[in-house]
Design a protein with these regions (language model features):
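A short acidic, often aromatic-flanked loop/helix-cap motif at beta-alpha or helix-coil junctions
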Residues: 2-3, 104, 194-198
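N-terminal Rossmann-like NAD(P)+-binding domain of SDR-like oxidoreductases, especially those catalyzing
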Residues: 1-98
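Structural element of the ATP-grasp superfamily
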Residues: 44, 83, 116, 208-212
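PG/GG-rich flexible active-site loop of Rossmann-like NAD(P)H-dependent oxidoreductases
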Residues: 63, 101, 168
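C-terminal substrate-binding subdomain of Rossmann-fold SDR/epimerase-dehydratase oxidoreductases
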Residues: 124-249
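Short-chain dehydrogenase/reductase
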Residues: 26, 100-101, 160-163
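NAD(P)-dependent short-chain dehydrogenase/reductase
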Residues: 71-73, 77, 81-136, 141-150, ...
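Residues in well-ordered alpha-helical elements
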Residues: 2-5, 24, 31, 42, ...
Length: 249
């Protein structure tokens, strides 16, 4: 806590990206997930208030629109309401960043895109829960980070922003794209046991305060973003140079 306080002292803006973000873990460990996400956020809010931070930017999720997402969604909904109340009571300005399906370098192991590509590289096959009809709007982390900086503009103060991709794709088509990148040498299997913690077509059924969607003027093409991530993951998994991967298929 002391190191965090030292880091915040003198800051104009605080981005709060820390937290437990694995939906699967949260469904099995609700106490740990809620303590981590809610109490961690409260600690940062108190420090932001103490040092009169100009604005508190919070990484939330599109799952706040949903009844899915297990205790991960519950913790993010709770944090949003707490942040809003801090603004009412103490004048601490905020911006809520509701992220969609992120992908890119340095992703956690539970990240869907990383999971797909790791399976493809290691096993030459991809197994997916569901039938592949699920719709997603993947956004590259570089685009998301750019929009997170854009969120500092005055018009986004005390606003809720919806940050997701502008290329909608079905999961089955995404997996086909990945297979084609590997010269169709990847087997694709769908498990009929649907993951009940994730949405299929849309997360919109909860009805929170409506968010504004912001999109970059230029953005990563999904195919190019996937190819770049394959190079990155293969280098880490097989300890090879990026130029070797597709030539060694």
């Amino acid at each position: 806590f002391g190191d965090v306080e030292k880091a915040i002292d003198g800051c104009e803006y605080v981005y709060h990206f820390a937290g437990q973000a694995d939906i699967g873990f949260s469904s099995k460990s609700p106490v740990e997930s809620i303590k981590n996400n809610i109490l961690g956020t409260l600690n940062l809010l108190e420090l932001a208030r103490k040092y009169e931070v100009e604005r508190f930017l919070f990484a939330s999720t599109i799952y706040v629109y949903s009844e899915l997402g297990s205790f991960y969604r519950v913790s993010k909904q709770s944090c949003e309401k707490i942040i809003e109340e801090y603004q009412k009571e103490f004048g601490l300005n905020y911006t809520i960043l509701r992220y969609g399906s992120l992908y890119g370098p340095r992703a956690n192991d539970f990240n869907a895109m990383k999971h797909f590509l790791t399976q493809a590289i290691k096993e030459k096959k991809i197994t997916r829960n569901g039938n592949g009809e699920e719709l997603r709007e993947y956004i590259h982390v570089k685009d998301a980070s750019s929009l997170s900086i854009t969120a500092l503009k005055k018009q986004y103060r005390n606003q809720h922003l919806f940050i997701t991709g502008n290329q909608q794709i079905r999961v089955k088509d995404l997996l086909k794209m990945i297979s084609e990148i590997f010269d169709n040498k990847i087997e694709i299997h769908f498990d009929s046991n649907r993951d009940t913690h994730h949405y299929e077509i849309t997360p919109f059924n909860f009805k929170p305060q409506i968010a504004k969607k912001i999109i970059p003027e230029t953005f990563y093409d999904l195919g190019q973003g996937i190819l770049d991530l394959i190079y990155d993951l293969d280098a880490k998994i097989n300890n090879v140079n990026n130029s070797e991967i597709l030539n060694s298929k």
